Amino acid sequence: MAYRKLGRTSSQRKAMLRDLTTDLLINESIVTTEARAKEIRKTVEKMITLGKRGDLHARRQAAAFVRNEIASENYDEATEKYTTTTALQKLFSEIAPRYAERNGGYTRILKTEPRRGDAAPMAIIELV
């Protein structure tokens, strides 16, 4: 199995990939190092494919990986209540239908200038 170690233990690496994947699903674009961007591309593609499948098993598999974070919060003036959407709900209701006709290639990596301080190669990863 080929993967990048990213200078971390396996548990730290898995936690970081879960965090970055969740952040990308919520914000649809993040700035990170090039190596991290190439690694999270794999997990994001898998999550969107699970979202496209849409059955209960796919939803549970995605819920086991994606963090339970609030993606958006809206105030409904009629009922005077806040409605929140989690990252998992956004994946299945907004992101997956957008890519219904697309077979893979849901992300784009754009290289940017090196990071100031350590000159690490940086990249923007975004949903197409």
UniProtKB/Swiss-Prot annotation:
GO molecular function, one term: structural constituent of ribosome
One Pfam entry name: Ribosomal_L17
GO biological process, one term: translation
Keyword Transmembrane helix: no
Top-level division of the source organism's lineage: Bacteria
Keywords: Ribonucleoprotein, Ribosomal protein
Protein's UniProt keywords contain Glycoprotein: no
Cellular component terms per the entry's GO annotation: cytosolic large ribosomal subunit
Family designation: Belongs to the bacterial ribosomal protein bL17 family.
UniProt subunit comment: Part of the 50S ribosomal subunit. Contacts protein L32.
PANTHER family the UniProt entry points to: LARGE RIBOSOMAL SUBUNIT PROTEIN BL17M, RIBOSOMAL PROTEIN L17
Full protein name: Large ribosomal subunit protein bL17
Protein's organism: Streptococcus sanguinis (strain SK36)
Gene (UniProt): rplQ
